Design a protein with these regions (language model features):
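A short, Lys/Arg-rich alpha-helix, primarily the initiator
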Residues: 1-23, 70, 106
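Hydrophobic side chains within well-formed alpha-helices
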Residues: 9, 64-65
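Short alpha-helical DNA-recognition segment
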Residues: 22-41
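The DNA-recognition helices of helix-turn-helix-type DNA-binding domains
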Residues: 35, 46, 61, 72-75
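Short, basic-rich loop-to-helix N-cap that marks the start of a DNA-contacting helix
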Residues: 46-59
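Short, charged recognition helix plus adjacent turn
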Residues: 67-109
Length: 109
């Protein structure tokens, strides 16, 4: 596992797509066919990358919509892992009900 923390896809859009081409949010939004607010929320990290935006970015820049979504997934997972100590669960294998019925019955109830 990499020790580098994943970058929010919006930062990638801003730093590697908009800025090098001298584009602001208004121009970028127009080219992508989205609202200024939608792109602003993405590049400032207030919103995540949607599958639709991933397709738009891939069409506008070339490349893969799946790669854009992988960036979002990596970022989201890293964010959840930061707070994983607050997530409390009971392992299913230790749950009493799991031992009281045959496995096949668990999924047919």
């Amino acid at each position: 596992m990499s020790s580098l923390y994943p970058i929010h896809p919006g930062v990638v859009v801003r730093e590697q797509c908009l800025n090098p081409h001298g584009l602001g949010v208004v121009e970028g939004a127009r080219l992508l066919g989205v609202s200024r607010q939608a792109l602003s929320n993405l590049v400032t990290g207030r919103a995540g990358l949607s599958p639709e935006m991933a397709v738009r970015l891939a069409k506008a820049l070339g490349g893969s919509d799946e790669r854009w979504m992988q960036l979002q997934f990596a970022y989201d997972l890293a964010e959840v892992r930061k707070k994983s100590h607050t997530i409390n669960v009971v392992p299913i294998t230790s749950y009493k009900y799991a031992h009281s019925k045959p496995q096949a019955e668990l999924f047919n109830s």
